[in-house]
């Protein structure tokens, strides 16, 4: 079964600690959700993924404007790990950003997004 995590969850705060050796790890279909500042306009995010076996993996970036409905704004494949990669998409206003994993044992080591709620 898939599991979702909020940026308020215990080890999820590590995604913003400037340390690529700490990470949140999930399996295919699992996701991590970040709350954005009120009325945030967003057109991209930088993410450092982590994976022990180094195999490429698919992922999705989804946005929500509230109400629990998420829309996929970016689908891609990660081939490089443990470094920040930039992902751009059409700009929109959103309240939450979600990263959905496409494989088992994939980690999110860091996320850089100025619009993250403090």
How does the language model describe each region?
Residues 25, 62, 74-75, 100:
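Residue-level detector of conserved, well-ordered beta-strand and adjacent loop positions
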Residues 50-52, 66, 104:
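Short coil/turn motifs at secondary-structure junctions
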Residues 67-68, 118:
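Structural alpha-beta junctions
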Residues 56, 72, 108-110:
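Generic domain-boundary/flexible-linker signal
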Residues 19, 31-48, 61, 84-114:
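Hydrophobic/aromatic beta-strand segments within beta-rich folds
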Residues 1, 6-38, 48-55, 79, ...:
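Disordered, acidic Ser/Thr/Pro-rich linker "stalks" and the adjacent N-terminal cap
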Residues 54-67:
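Short, surface-exposed beta-strand/strand-loop-strand elements in extracellular ectodomains
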Residues 71-90:
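Extracellular carbohydrate recognition and processing domains
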